[in-house]
């Protein structure tokens, strides 16, 4: 039993839409970072699906997916470090209360 390409693309589209919804509607900075990670995981699903179905013998999609995972890990580490610093200074992670021009 094989899963068709459309199923993977639908799953990735749903995950990406959930990530965009969370990015737009969330005021919490940690939730915004989680939404960005969800969107990057949807991109990874697309890369893996297209790599498997378009050219199964070459590993181009897997290489790009590893690259995206690496960038996502670096983004998460830097983002959480910035959020931790802001939390120590402001005592909140509410995005609307962040105004870096005014201390």
UniProtKB/Swiss-Prot annotation:
It is found in: Plastid, Organellar chromatophore thylakoid membrane. InterPro entries: NADH_UbQ_OxRdtase_chain4L/K (IPR001133), NUOK/Mnh_C1-like (IPR039428). It is an enzyme of class 7 (translocase). It is a multi-pass membrane protein. GO terms for biological process: ATP synthesis coupled electron transport. Coiled coil: none annotated. Keywords: Membrane, NAD, NADP, Organellar chromatophore, Plastid, Plastoquinone, Quinone, Thylakoid, Translocase, Transmembrane, Transmembrane helix, Transport. The chain crosses the membrane at residues 3-23, 32-52, 63-83. It catalyses: a plastoquinone + NADH + (n+1) H(+)(in) = a plastoquinol + NAD(+) + n H(+)(out); a plastoquinone + NADPH + (n+1) H(+)(in) = a plastoquinol + NADP(+) + n H(+)(out). GO terms for molecular function: NADH:ubiquinone reductase (non-electrogenic) activity; quinone binding. GO terms for cellular component: NADH dehydrogenase complex; organellar chromatophore thylakoid membrane; plasma membrane; plastid. Belongs to the complex I subunit 4L family. NDH is composed of at least 16 different subunits, 5 of which are encoded in the nucleus. This is NAD(P)H-quinone oxidoreductase subunit 4L, organellar chromatophore. It comes from Paulinella chromatophora. The gene is ndhE.
């Amino acid at each position: 039993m094989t899963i068709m390409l459309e199923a993977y693309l639908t799953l990735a589209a749903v995950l990406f839409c959930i990530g965009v919804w969370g990015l737009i509607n969330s005021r919490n900075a940690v939730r915004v970072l989680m939404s960005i990670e969800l969107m990057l995981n949807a991109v990874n699903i697309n890369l893996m699906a297209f790599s498997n179905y378009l050219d199964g013998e070459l590993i181009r999609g897997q290489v790009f997916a590893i690259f995206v995972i690496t960038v996502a890990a670096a983004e998460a580490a830097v983002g959480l470090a910035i959020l931790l610093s802001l939390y120590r200074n402001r005592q909140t992670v509410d995005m609307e209360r962040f105004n870096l021009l005014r201390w």
